[in-house]
Each structure stands twice: as C-alpha cells, then as structure tokens.
Amino acid sequence: MSAASSAIPKRSDPRLLDQKKSAKSTLPKNTPENGVSTVKNLQHVPCKFFRNGTCTAGENCPFSHSLETERPICKYFLKGNCKFGPKCALSHALPGNTNLPNGTSTNTMASMAANGGASSVASKQMGANQISPSLSSKTMKNPADKANNTTATDVRGNTATSPYFPFSRSPGRHSGNSTINGMMTTPNFLSSGVNSRSVDEFNNSSSGFPSSLNGIPIASPPLATSPTSFSLASSASSTNLGGSKGLLFQQMTSENNRDYFSRRPTLLNTYGNRCSSTDTLSSLSRLTSQDPLKASLPLQSPPLAPKTGVSLSRPRLTLDQSLGNLSLGSGINQRRQVPRSNSYAGAFPSVVSASLPTKVDLNHQMDVSDEEQRFLSTPLGSFDESILGSSPINRLSSSFKQYTSSLKSPGLSTRTSSTMNSLNSSRFGAYFSKSRYVEGSGSMSTTPLATSVNNSYKLPSGFSVREEAVFSSPTTEGSRPVSLARLKSEPIFRSDTASPETIAGLGDTKNDPVVSTNNSVSRITVANSSPPWNSTVEEETPFQMDD
C-alpha cells in the first residue's frame, strides 16, 4: 500500500502554481526562478534613447528614465578617445564643474549630451557662433527682459561649441543669419542685460543695426570709442553748433572743404601758407570779440592760424595768452597737449575746447616725423616775412629784384645799416663773416703779406657765407667808388694803389682783425666785443670759390 502510494505522483496544489507564475512575471527577463540576478543593475545609467525620445522598451527598460540621475564620468572621455561622442550614455563632463580646453563649460556639455541629436543638429547649423556666457548671470530689470532672456538662454544652450566638430569655425567668424527652430537670429548680436531694450530707446543711437529681431533683442555693435565718450562728444558739439550736426559731421565736412589741399604738409606750400604772428593775433581777437561761443570749437580756418609763437632767436619763445576759451601756445608743446580731432591734427594742431572729451580720435594720425614738423611749424616774424618773402624761392627772387632795381634807381635805400657799412664784401657778391667767435682777446704772429701804407691792413675774418647775403646789397652810383676801393683794400684782391684813407670812416671796424706790421713781423689783435648774430634769418653755409 505504501509502495503504491509512492508510485502515484502527487498532484500539486493549483494555488501554488498561480503564485509561481505571478513571481516569474514580476522578475526581469534575465532573472532566473530562484530570484538571483545574473547581470548588473543598470538603473543608475540613464537611457540614451529616452533622452532622444526614441526608447521603445518603456517600463521594461533596464536603464533609468530619470533626467535627474547623476551619470558617472566616461573614462574614455577623460582620455580623449571616446568613440560615441555626444551619444555616449556616460557623462562627458570634467570633475569639479570646470571648463573644457576649448572654453565650453561642463554645464553646457551636459545640456548638449542631454539633448542628444537635437544639440548636434543645432551645433551644425550654428557652427561655432557662441553667445556671451554672462547672459544667464545677468539680472533682468523688468518682466519683458526676463521673457527675452529665456529665449536667448535656450538658444545659448543649443549653440555652444562642441569638441566633436573639429572643423567648426572660430567664434569670431560667422556667416550672416542662422535659423533655429524656424526663428531668425543674428550671430554675436544677442543682447546682454544692459543692451536688451526696445527699439524706441535706440532712436538717438549711432548704431545702424536694429535692436530687436523677431522678439530676440540684439545688441548694438561696438563703437570706435566708448559709447559714453562718443555721446558726450556728440552732445557737446551739437550744443556749441546750436544744431543737430555732431562731431563726426564736422570731420567729414572739414575733409571736403576748400582747405583740404592746404592741409597736406609740403615744404614750399607750408612756407607759402604761413601767416605772420600779428595777423594771427588780430584774427583770434576778432573771433573772440564777435562770437565767444564759437571760440571753443575747432577752427575751420587754415590750420596754421592758431600758431602764434614769435621766433626772435634760436630758442623759440612761448607765448601763452588767454583769449576767451582759447589757450594759445607755440611749437611742439602745443601739439602734444591739444586733443586731436582729425588725421591732420598731428601736423597742424588746432585749438579745441577743454570741455570736449580727449579720447575722441576717429582717424589715425599722420606718420610724419617730429623733425620735419618742427621745421615746418617754425613761424616767421612779420618783419622777416615782409622783407624776405614767405618761401625760399620768394626770398631769392625778392633779393635779386632788389639788386637789379638798385642798378637803375640810385636813390634806393638799403635794407639795413650794417649791410653797407660792412667791410666783408667781395667782388663775388657774398659777405665773408666769422665762422666762429673768439672768446677773449688774443694775439698771433704772422708774416707780413705785403708792404702797405701806414703799415695797416684789413683782413677777412673767415670763408663762410650767410644765406641772406647770397646777393650783395644794392650798389648805388654814389657808393660805387667806395665799393671799388673796398675791394682793392682786401689782401686777397689787393693792388699796389690801395690806401688806408679809402677804407676809413666806412663803419665801425673795431671787431675786425687789424694787422700792424713792425720790422717784418705783423701781429693780429682780435677784440671780444662781437654781438651775437641773429640766427633766426641768417644761416651759415660753406662758400667755395672756383679757380
């Protein structure tokens, strides 16, 4: 009985079978009946298909469908050889929330990886056009700015540079407009918190770009100078002019006016355009007396007019006078202090009001050496200019005209008294003068040149000729015998019929060397009473006589 009972198989309870079926259905696919899992738990790994919206496993997916799950860092990304790129399920962010070598933050990389394919498509469309990283850190002032900033922030999250596009362009190079989700934007002009304003606030701005485009604020392009200084310059010039024409309009008109060619620095043209100090002072005083408001503006007259330094000797004198709002100076000091308003201000300084900003410089300065400008900016005195003319050619021509006219008119007066009274002239028409000044009185021995009457001769002082004496002084009919006698008295062109009476009384000769002969030995005594030469007009040049 017992054997038969053991041979008959026991029928299982149907309740137990139902419990086993329900237990199998709750376990994962790869989980055996004993409940021990043979694979790793992947619930901490986010599902990359779920992030792209293409996961078909649903609840049976072994990966996490939570966007807040913190992913581990991909070790291949740290090595730089991850083959999955933005499709990798692991995190491609450096530890410590630092920035990547290309300047992209880890938060941006995380958002790119979260967006997956959409981020890669947006990156391909936008190239490397990055938005300012300070966009999200700006504090908005009104709700409209907040609404505009959210759109710009979304665009920024999708347009950051990806390290997996090595052939993308640099941030500074962009091509026109880009399209994101059917919305037109302008690269590199998405606004920050300061410039995100409406179009009405940019009516008086000098920008030529619209301030908003399809709801996205656009910043104005950078100016040549700071916007504050440029607006101050425009407002100051508009106030002085009494109109709406600003500083830029003045500069454009000054380039096209009739004085444009006179602004080009040339040697003869600059000499010809220079005016005397007397005319300059009178014109400036007339300007300040008629309209004191225009005195603070850049002068539109010929640019050499404000220079009023009177050159009386080699060290130039500085003349500082205050006429209304004008501060007058001379020479290189005025050029260093006056703010420049156009490209010719370095060569020809103009008087500008101190109320204008000193950083307004829209053009480059002319590349002209200081030595040339110092020569060109040396003004002539009214007396020297009236006699010698305004240019070197005019000087020579005027002197030659005086010489030729003197031969026809005996009554023509000489230029200076020392010209006719000087004993240092020769038949070549040049004045021989001292090339150096002897300090102190000294004596030297020399052999007598020839016997003479009363043992006294006049000797030339040197062989250097002055510029203003290239043409000799006018010789009248009354002074012609005296000049001939003077030529005969010179030792170089001496004749035996010379007498000391012919050279007596012609002028003060105490500064010239006098030779007194005593028993075949002559002694030259030089007095130290020579006045300093006026070096403003006269320039010494070497003189060479032909055989």
Curated annotation (Swiss-Prot):
Transmembrane residue ranges: none
Sequence positions bearing Phosphothreonine: 502
Modified residues (Phosphoserine): 343, 353, 355, 483, 489, 495, 499
PROSITE patterns xrefs: ZF_C3H1
Composition bias, Polar residues: 24-37, 147-162, 526-536
Ranges of compositional bias, category Acidic residues: 537-547
InterPro entries, per the entry: MKRN-like, Znf-CCCH_4, Znf_CCCH, Znf_CCCH_sf
Gene Ontology biological-process entries: mRNA metabolic process; protein polyubiquitination; protein ubiquitination
Modified residues (Phosphotyrosine): 344
Official protein name in the record: Uncharacterized protein C1739.01
Annotated organism of origin: Schizosaccharomyces pombe (strain 972 / ATCC 24843)
